[in-house]
């Protein structure tokens, strides 16, 4: 009889260790911002919109585009709020050029510019609307 009791105690000990080693996630608050994948479609659309609005409002002769998304978060409200921290870089494309995808970044030190920008974009996907509700940038 000692053998089944030992087996049961061993099994309970293993389960206790496994439970203790499992990472705990705190309770998620409904509607709170959560981390988002920078490659997900909604984030990409929000980023494209933010970069477009950034370039429209810029007095620079050259377009800028995202070098990398440093952090992406989203919040489900009546639509979706996206909070994007983005490293931006100045490209060689002037404002008269429209396709930013193929624009290389300036590599000449006197023309090279980088900025770290935080964008907040409100999107209502089922209506196809976006608005840039807040943004700030600082030189990097």
From Swiss-Prot:
Annotated PROSITE patterns: CYSTATIN (PS00287)
GO CC annotation: axon; basement membrane; collagen-containing extracellular matrix; contractile muscle fiber; extracellular space; multivesicular body; neuronal cell body; nuclear membrane
Disulphide bonds in the chain: 93-103, 117-137
UniProt motif Secondary area of contact: location: 75-79
Signal peptide: 1-20
InterPro entries: Cystatin_dom, Cystatin_sf, Prot_inh_cystat_CS
Lineage summary: Eukaryota, Metazoa, Chordata, Craniata, Vertebrata
Principal location listed in the UniProt entry: secreted
Pfam families according to UniProt: Cystatin
UniProt GO molecular function: cysteine-type endopeptidase inhibitor activity; protease binding
Cell location: Secreted
Listed Gene3D superfamilies: 3.10.450.10
Record PANTHER family: CYSTATIN, CYSTATIN-C
Site (Reactive site): 31
Family: Belongs to the cystatin family.
Annotated GO biological process: cellular response to hydrogen peroxide; embryo implantation; eye development; positive regulation of cell population proliferation; positive regulation of DNA replication; response to axon injury; response to carbohydrate; response to estradiol
Membrane spanning residue stretches: none
Function comment: As an inhibitor of cysteine proteinases, this protein is thought to serve an important physiological role as a local regulator of this enzyme activity.
Protein name: Cystatin-C
Keywords annotated in UniProt: Disulfide bond, Protease inhibitor, Secreted, Signal, Thiol protease inhibitor
């Amino acid at each position: 009889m000692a053998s089944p009791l030992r087996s049961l105690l061993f099994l309970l000990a293993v389960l206790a260790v496994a439970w203790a080693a499992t990472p705990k996630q705190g309770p998620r608050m409904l509607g709170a911002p959560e981390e988002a994948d920078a490659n997900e479609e909604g984030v990409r659309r929000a980023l494209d919109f933010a970069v477009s609005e950034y370039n429209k409002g810029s007095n620079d002769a050259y377009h800028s585009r995202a070098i990398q998304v440093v952090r992406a978060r989203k919040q489900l409200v009546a639509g979706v709020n996206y909070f994007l921290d983005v490293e931006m870089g100045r490209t060689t494309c002037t404002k008269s050029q429209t396709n930013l995808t193929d624009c290389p970044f300036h590599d000449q030190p006197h023309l090279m510019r980088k900025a770290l920008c935080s964008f907040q974009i409100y999107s209502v996907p089922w209506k196809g609307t976006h608005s840039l509700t807040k943004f700030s940038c600082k030189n990097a």
